[in-house]
Amino acid sequence: MEREKSKFEVTMESNSSLQRFVKNKLAMSGLVFIFLMVLVSVFGSLLRLDKTENANDQKLSLALCKPGFSVNYVSKKFEENEWIPISKSEAIGDSIRVELFEKNGGGETVIFALSDLKKDSKGEVVSQKKFWLGTDKYGRDVLSRLMAGASVSLLVGTIAVLISLLLGVTLGLWAGYFKGWVDAVISYFIQVVWAIPTLLLVMAICFAFGTGFWKVFVAVGLTMWVEVARITRGQVLGIREKEYIEAAKAIGNSSSRIIFRHVLPNVLSPIIVMSAANFASAILMEAGLSFLGLGAQIPTPSWGNMIRESYSYLTTDMAYLAFLPGVCIMLLVLSFMMVGNGLRDALDVREN
């Protein structure tokens, strides 16, 4: 007679799965990169050069500067995150005369009172900024935009996966456990949604509800639940016939108790693996929508938006402006795929 595993057996299997996952170097490499991206997303506003909201501080005089470019600047008091790039400065008594920065020289000369300017940690009114990855066509720091874009990608992945789990697991559990007309209705609905191309469905939802930061995230999530529901249903159909499920029914346990206490814990492994894959798909989908102008809207930083703004430079020496966000998308998606493969191997999803 097949019985339900004891808590001790479950704990031992969990420890064994964790050990297998930790030994997987590719999976751990992906997990480390994801962890770094999470840190950048959470603490990015403190770390990046451009500390404005959305990293959208535009300085047209600094447009399309090369990586490693440095510029001196002065900042006025009582004007947060406001700074003025300069090329020359000269102290004149209680004032300072500066030449505003222009890439071709010949900037306007302006005189400021020293009492109106902020001082840095060294007590100097003239400071320096370094743009490690250069600036875009609006004079914004590329590195700051990339760091800010990481939070958008991780947020869309998180929201989309949560929505897909909420819908997919719920419908899959109902269809697999209750069978009959419930299974027939839900399966028919799944097949209808499954037949519609994902990108086309997302675009239809965006057109119906409008573009926007949160609307796009919800739209992506509403298109990713189908596969979760199919996998959950298939797993539940097998588990519901186990003898320990029949025993739970015989002693009078309610359907909800059986589903959440005995069925759901036994279908989590493939759902976890699917969630990692869905996370990667959501990031790719959001980037594609942003590139098409249907995703996160300007000035919200998005790697897809950055590629859209800079793809015209692909045949010039500024091609890195489109290449860098593309690399970020590739690395983050690859990391989630490696973690997903590691979870699949560690949890023995294929064998089970």
Briefly describe each language-model feature range.
Residues T135-N352:
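Alpha-helical transmembrane segments of integral membrane proteins
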Residues M1-L165, V169, Y313-L314, M318-L334, ...:
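Gly/Trp-centered helix-boundary motif
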